[in-house]
Amino acid sequence: MRRNQYGQPIGEALPHWQPAGMPGHTPLQGRFCRLEPLNLERWGDALYQAYQTAEDDRDWTYLFWERPQSRADFQRYLQAQASSADRNTMVVIDRANGRAVGTCAFLRIDPANGVAELGTINWSPLMKRSALGSEAIFLMLRHLFDDLGYRRCEWKCDSLNLPSRQAAERLGFRYEGT
């Protein structure tokens, strides 16, 4: 371990570091699912139908938005995600049937430092407790680290959202504090 002039551990120098690329602009192909950048015209109706299969609003509790109550509200929700400067939202497509079944996003993207966050993860009932969710996150991580050369990926969730915290830990993320 490298140390500074005071004997403090400071980690290894990165003299050849180059800024990473921007994630979320290319489709990502897996065995069970495919991720595509959010396209409102192509996926809006299918996503609305997928989220309508939920019995209630509980899946929206920890998101920044309440569950849209109409197709028009849902369109505004998608437009807000698509127009945000600090996120690239991806649509999860089930390869078995070609249906859009959820969304996830690259957030707080910082190519200069090689850091990005995964968040606004919203799986419809059509993909919960299936290989689709794990593979979607794997595809995002592989894209960040292997394709683009990122050094760090963060998973931020509400501290009360136990299912999200458990999923993050299962996928290898470590709690760093609140």
Question: Locations of the language-model features?
Answer:
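GNAT-family acyltransferases
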Residues: 1-130, 143
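Glycine-rich acyl-CoA binding loop
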Residues: 133-134
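Conserved GNAT acetyl-CoA-binding A-motif
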Residues: 146-156
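Conserved beta-strand-loop-alpha-helix junction that forms the acyl-donor binding cleft
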Residues: 155-165
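Conserved catalytic-core motifs of GNAT/GCN5-like acyltransferases
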Residues: 174-178
